[in-house]
Amino acid sequence: MDLVMLLVLTLTCLILLSIWRQSSGRGKLPPGPIPLPIIGNIFQLNVKNITQSLTSFSKVYGPVFTLYFGTKPTVILHGYEAVKEALIDHGEEFAERGSFPVAEKINKDLGIVFSHGNRWKEIRRFTLTTLRNLGMGKRNIEDRVQEEARCLVEELRKTNGSPCDPTFILGCAPCNVICSIIFQNRFDYKDQDFLNLMEKLNENMKILSSPWTQFCSFFPVLIDYCPGSHTTLAKNVYHIRNYLLKKIKEHQESLDVTNPRDFIDYYLIKWKQENHNPHSEFTLENLSITVTDLFGAGTETTSTTLRYALLLLLKCPEVTAKVQEEIDRVVGKHRSPCMQDRSRMPYTDAHDHEVQRFIDLIPTNLPHAVTCDIKFRNYLIPKGTTIITSLSSVLHDSKEFPDPEIFDPGHFLDGNGKFKKSDYFMPFSAGKRMCAGEGLARMELFLFLTTILQNFKLKSVLHPKDIDTTPVFNGFASLPPFYELCFIPL
């Protein structure tokens, strides 16, 4: 009995100590629900729909509030004003990468997505400069995307108008574009290496968006001591990285420093230039992780958006008809669509923006962190605190986008039918950590979709009213449900 009493007393003291430590720090941090000892607010969150949970909390605590994932505080920013104030008005202070334990374990603070501090700044600056040198935003890259769009059309013709799952084919096109940028060549859609890479990328997107991965983010100790899909994620990343390491080795053997061919060549030249510097960030290991980041980010986000776009076109045949009418009128049948067409196609442009707004691909963004102690809206946020910015709350703001849960390209059209920009359009995030490939992704979305609709009528195997567009995952990413469709040649 004495032992039981001692255990109860000890546990009570630990709980009181935990509550005191958290409440003493909460005087400086924004308000939020009272966390439980050790586990924090985890049981107050719906890990299958974190966005919904954050919206509920914001109604109680306002647009800036604190949640505890385990024993660590995380500040949540909800709504356009709070997100803009942090990421744009205080961009430098909110530019650090926040905690993402599953990725940190794999990337080891290297690459462009999950690195920190000066290392991240140097690699990002180099990446943006190199992408510009390779023609990003210029005709060179546009030519590559147009060529891949033509290959995509030929591959879709091979389906002979039969029902098919578009996942793999729609993944191949953006993947080939990023491959041409990284190591200068594309794959045939039947190439076995390509099939394997695409399978790994697709599986990883599902794993990252699963409740288990969200749970591992709250309790990182699970990554080391519990089996789970995070081990499959790591194996898939290492498989992709090993393939890219072979490409790097081939480039080392054929490198001509006077004539760089692609991203790997530019990096190897920089690596050689800094070989004398023992503190250089430009190591071969960092190269392998950076190109893996580019490979994954440049493929899955665009392919998922394309897949969702076709599903929404099937669901809304009246929208499809308007887009196809505009394509017929502006582009016609005898040439490929080009980026110059977009300014004369306001409805199609509005449609592409509405797809990205509506699907809300990365609902809570990648986590940020503050680079220093900062006073934000009369709260003191300590250096290193993880920041979650709810992009959903911006993209689905009912004041900016009336009836935000309805898919309507009119959200981006003015009263005269002209395209209307919105500061609330943040699918690529904002500020210092904004997606480096935004321009490429928007180009691919426009050219791939217009080329598909120029050449095919989309036919659903279900009646439009029976098509479900609800995402099957809503964690890291919102992924569309499985569906099939027919590509009927025009």
Swiss-Prot record:
Query: Where, per UniProt, does this protein localize?
Result: Endoplasmic reticulum membrane; Microsome membrane
Q: Which organism is it from?
A: Rattus norvegicus
Its membrane topology is listed as:
Peripheral membrane protein
Q: What's the cofactor?
A: heme
Output the Gene Ontology terms for molecular function. arachidonate 14,15-epoxygenase activity; enzyme binding; heme binding; iron ion binding; long-chain fatty acid omega-1 hydroxylase activity; monooxygenase activity; oxidoreductase activity; oxidoreductase activity, acting on paired donors, with incorporation or reduction of molecular oxygen, reduced flavin or flavoprotein as one donor, and incorporation of one atom of oxygen
Induction, per UniProt: P450 can be induced to high levels in liver and other tissues by various foreign compounds, including drugs, pesticides, and carcinogens.
Question: Mind telling me which GO cellular component terms the entry cites?
Answer: cytoplasm; endoplasmic reticulum membrane; intracellular membrane-bounded organelle
**Which named protein is this?**
Cytochrome P450 2C6
Q: Which domain of life is it from?
A: Eukaryota
Which protein family is named in the record?
A: Belongs to the cytochrome P450 family.
